[in-house]
Amino acid sequence: EDNLFRPFADHISIDSPQFFNRIHNHSTWGNAAVGMIGLVMGDDELVERALYGIPFEEIDVAAKDDDGGFIFDKDGRAGFLANLDEPFSPDGYYTEGPYYQRYAMYPFLVFAQGLHNARPELDIFSQKDGVLLKAVDALLNLSDADGEFFPLNDGQKGMSYQTASLVSAVNIAYLVGGEDPRLLGIAEEQGKVLLDDAGIAVALGIRDGKAQPFDKRSVNLSDGPDGSQGGLAVLRQGDEHLTLVFKYGAQGLSHGHYDKLSFSLFEKGDEVLQDYGLVRFVNIEQKGGGNYLKENTTWAKQTIAHNALVQNETSHFGGKYEIGSQHHSELYFYDDANS
């Protein structure tokens, strides 16, 4: 404990405050790691550090992370609970987009399950009106007919709910969220379960014939911590014969793009009208570990790269993150009666 786990937890947090404290999907992993170490060792200080971040007197509240986004939220909060409150809307939409929500759901739900078991008084799955469970439902609805997530913001194409993080999310949400039989339908498609109490619950539910199809529907998900920063609309015709994805939300933190009115159109999972996403050497270790190219900012994030109107030959908000993050689109009407 003293020679490995505590030094490791300190390195993740105290030695790296500008990353541990930020509101970002990467930080959720750090929060969860420190918190899980604290839960196992019975170290309340580590658990508190994970939940609320570390003091930031020596860090500029306006400082940015290596992705160009602000480290703290507007109120200067940090830690796991801040990452639960700030990026998620009341509907469970994650402002960075479904690709990054998929990545973050593992630490969110695994640490939450640990808190649920070891700190029941925190009632973590009821935080923000049960937003973690809503997030699983929202994320599954943000996939096409093939189960692949819509590539919003910097989202990589081809990532689906077959990934390990979604197996965990579906299993845990089923166990602690009232055993929604629709989740069993997704679990059947995934074809695997966790080797724990959540996985056993899912396996038994499928064995007992409780599974129901997860019928993806037209949805209009709000964006922003209080749901007032625009949103994301998905209009589906029939059995996903046609699916329109219309983004009119907030910036999307550091992974967001300078477009507030972009759209994509799918036919049975195939792109008919695509919306440009990212420029990245995915999984090519020799290329900076598979990082983003500079063209991700100079081209892919700009409004001209999207299915959005460009005025005066310039990106929305001049392509400036500080300005774009202060603004969002407004919803005037939404009607899916014919879908």
Regions found by a protein language model. Give the residues of each.
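Aromatic-lined, polymer-binding surfaces characteristic
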Residues: 1-133, 137, 143
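Catalytic and substrate-binding regions of extracellular carbohydrate-active enzymes
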Residues: 184-339
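C-terminal, helix-dominated tail/subdomain
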Residues: 123-199
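Generic hydrophobic alpha-helical segments
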Residues: 41, 57, 115, 146, ...
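Acidic side chains
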Residues: 91, 154-156, 259, 275
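Generic secondary-structure boundary/loop-capping signal
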Residues: 91, 149, 306-308
